[in-house]
Amino acid sequence: MSATALSRLNPVSQFGFQRIVAGKSKSFFSNSGQRRLFSDSSRFRQAMAASGSLPVFGDACLDDLVTTCSNGLDFTKKRSSGGSFTINCPVASMRLGKRGGMMKNRLVCHYSVVDPLEKSRALFGTLSKSVHTSPMACFSVGPAHELSSLNGGSQESPPTTTTSLKSLRLVSGSCYLPHPEKEATGGEDAHFICDEEQAIGVADGVGGWAEVGVNAGLFSRELMSYSVSAIQEQHKGSSIDPLVVLEKAHSQTKAKGSSTACIIVLKDKGLHAINLGDSGFTVVREGTTVFQSPVQQHGFNFTYQLESGNSADVPSSGQVFTIDVQSGDVIVAGTDGVYDNLYNEEITGVVVSSVRAGLDPKGTAQKIAELARQRAVDKKRQSPFATAAQEAGYRYYGGKLDDITAVVSYVTSS
């Protein structure tokens, strides 16, 4: 594997952790997905390679395949400090057709199948809109553990829709492309889709643990597996709180390694989500990116991450979001394999063209993942990761080869 010399121009310290740079330059492997992590023995960070994405899926069928795309009907083989956000987005319309279909849901965590969930459906639709992006909508900010939001933002709140949120549901599909060098082990990412509980989630294990003999994919898959269990428990008695789900899952996860996490739930008061690290999600409405979760990093390529115990970041360090959604919205959740290689405009463009062509969520997720992979191996095109590296004082150009997970949800009226 070829390496690219990444020269460090301005070494800095952030958040009390010295960034790891040998002298004034270091060898940075463009295809390794190298990322910093907390070490087992202390809070000192070491630069280690990160990779891919492995799905933990609420409606899944176990398969030996590594590259997977799913519609909730079959399945096989990163950003700022914590806070609470309330997002109000304009009304949008997208006509979705409906196709009934019932089958049992199973969670697939790489090679392990978890307890059945409930029912599933697949809805499909079309949309024809132009592509553009807009600034973040009105929002409120507060600590993640404070579920009541503070007033904030400078834009006026858009009018609310007359459509009852209780009549909305998520129709989700996913696609996963592992790092070519990690296909044998399935990579380090995990994700889930819980159709009945209206929840999705992604996690990106920090692959640098492989240097000390640890498969971080075990941590991310266990974290997502326990997240599904926590979602099922909450679904039986009360509304689902993504932060509580992540806290419970983190407390139960004992595997070695570390991981980012993003959990999204559709509830009666809108879309509720928590994001910790450099995975994230985007909300697209009428050809517009109305929201993208900000990156949580202690420094460049130094993502927030959960680890067994409390030696790294904790769930409450994540950002909590409450977002108004409308029928016709498209939600894209992904690991940094997506967001390091695709700009907002590119993701939105794929969503618009895919829905216009009548693709279901699985098809849209596949298109996003495929474009991200194309960008990842293109050394002549500027990428979000390259932009961030350059802003941090490194000489870097091209994409970043990594595991890629894309989970796409259509918001539709039931």
Swiss-Prot record:
One Pfam entry name: PP2C_2
Superkingdom field: Eukaryota
Entry note: cofactor: Binds 2 magnesium or manganese ions per subunit.
InterPro entries xrefs: PPM-type-like_dom_sf, PPM-type_phosphatase-like_dom, PPTC7
Residue ranges of domain PPM-type phosphatase in the record: 174-411
Entry's EC annotation: 3.1.3.16
Cofactor: Mg(2+); Mn(2+)
GO molecular function: metal ion binding; protein serine/threonine phosphatase activity
Enzyme superclass (EC): hydrolase
Protein's UniProt keywords contain Magnesium: yes
Reaction(s) catalysed by this chain's protein: O-phospho-L-seryl-[protein] + H2O = L-seryl-[protein] + phosphate; O-phospho-L-threonyl-[protein] + H2O = L-threonyl-[protein] + phosphate
UniProt keywords, alphabetically: Hydrolase, Magnesium, Manganese, Metal-binding, Protein phosphatase
One GO cellular component, as annotated: chloroplast
Gene3D superfamilies registered for this protein in UniProt: PPM-type phosphatase domain (3.60.40.10)
SUPFAM superfamilies: PP2C-like
UniProt-annotated binding residues for Mn(2+) 1: 204-205
Residue numbers binding Mn(2+) 2: 204, 336, 402
Family note: Belongs to the PP2C family.
Protein name: Probable protein phosphatase 2C 80
Species assigned in the record: Arabidopsis thaliana
